[in-house]
Curated annotation (Swiss-Prot):
BP term (GO), one: nervous system development
Keyword terms: Endoplasmic reticulum, Golgi apparatus, Neurogenesis
Cell location: Golgi apparatus, cis-Golgi network; Endoplasmic reticulum
SUPFAM superfamilies: Ligand-binding domain in the NO signalling and Golgi transport
Family to which this protein belongs: Belongs to the TRAPP small subunits family. BET3 subfamily.
Listed CDD domains: TRAPPC6A_Trs33 (cd14944)
Claim: Endoplasmic reticulum is one of the keywords in the record: yes
Record protein name field: Trafficking protein particle complex subunit 6b
Amino acid sequence: MADEALFQFLHSEIIQYVNSAETGESENGRCVSKLENMGFRVGQGLIERFTKDTPRFKDELDVMKFICKDFWTSVFKKQIDNLRTNHQGIYVLQDNKFRLLTQLSAGKQYLEHAPKFLAFTCGLVRGALSNIGVKSIVTAEVSVMPACKFQVMIQKM
């Protein structure tokens, strides 16, 4: 329980630090980009440790199941609520109570701040997939707080 609170506090402080370094409208995109790059590096390191003793994955779906179950549980203390795919390289991971958004108020005015709180996690997933050998683009969307959807588009090489 304590480590969860520490992670949430550290995450919000990182957002505040990066946001204070970048001010203005055009810098908002730069802030999101920096947060995603931080998450990318952390995701690479975490997945390396988590898959150290894991047998090789059979296919993309196997990798995504690992991300949704084991990886997500290690980072956020719960599994993804829903995983959907079109079997053509697009996966949608849905978390109905995303821990990093639960601290924000559910009002519509806070939806504009949500991308900053999701950028690190997008980078985390992209970095994890990259280190496994899966090139991807990860985006996130929030329609109702604190639920969010992460869309993972696998890029074929």
